[in-house]
Amino acid sequence: MALLLSQPHFSGPLLLLVVSNLLLWEKAASNLPCVAEEGGCWNPLLETFNSATQKAETLHNLADQLYVELYYNQFSSGQFWDFSSQIIRQDKTVVRAGSYCHSSLTNPPNTGVHINIEIASYLKTLINFVGSWISPLFHLVIELSATKDVPETILSKAKEIEENNRQILSDLRWILTKVSPAAEMTEEFPHWEYLSFLKSSDKNNKFLAMFNLSYCIDHDSKYILLQLRLLKCLITGKDC
């Protein structure tokens, strides 16, 4: 069973072959434990996937809106359009900020070949991917809250993005404990290289960090949503 896992800021296809005895998974999916309730059966695992997917959809919509607003709101539009001009002129510092995302360090290798991976390992990879955004988004909210003349629309979106990402991570951690109770998880969240830029008193550095963050979370939110949908299909057999 070949699944295409491609992240927007990577080039080339990544094919992931899940070989953790899918026939057993499919059989288990049809017999998932549920809690009997009046009017039907409530499946905690399925409901958690539904909740996480809804949060991921919200995360993606907000990230997309924030990315656009930072380009067109007077608060940041001047700096963002200047950065775009510098990318055209091939300024290496700005090109990197507008194309490289620290979260890529948590991705499966982009080799273009079939990779054997167990469901638990797949979940762990996604946990580290989502977790890589905990610190950057937390500090973005702190810095925006302390910055003069920040529009409420930008600050509120940043807060909602941070909250949704944090809740998705919590859902994924819970799902892992139910899917693979014996699995040992070592969370390794990569360092965001623009954190010092974000905390800088230099206005250009601060906005360059926001330029990188807004680009990457916009792209990564699409990836998170895709992976949640694929995992939901593999583990629960629903919405495939």
Swiss-Prot record:
Disulfide partners: C34-C41, C101-C216, C233-C240
GO molecular function terms attached to this record: hormone activity; signaling receptor binding
Entry keyword annotation includes Endoplasmic reticulum: no
Compartments in which it is found: Secreted
Recorded GO CC terms: extracellular region
Keywords noted in UniProt: Disulfide bond, Glycoprotein, Hormone, Secreted, Signal
Residues the record marks as carrying a glycan: N212
InterPro entries the UniProt entry points to: 4_helix_cytokine-like_core, Somatotropin/Prolactin
Organ and tissue specificity: Expressed specifically in the spongiotrophoblast and trophoblast giant cells from the junctional zone of the chorioallantoic placenta.
Signal peptide: 1-30
Gene3D superfamilies recorded: 1.20.1250.10
Domain of life: Eukaryota
PANTHER family registered for this protein in UniProt: PROLACTIN-8A6-RELATED, SOMATOTROPIN,PROLACTIN
Annotated family: Belongs to the somatotropin/prolactin family.
Protein name, per record: Prolactin-8A6
Source organism (scientific name): Mus musculus
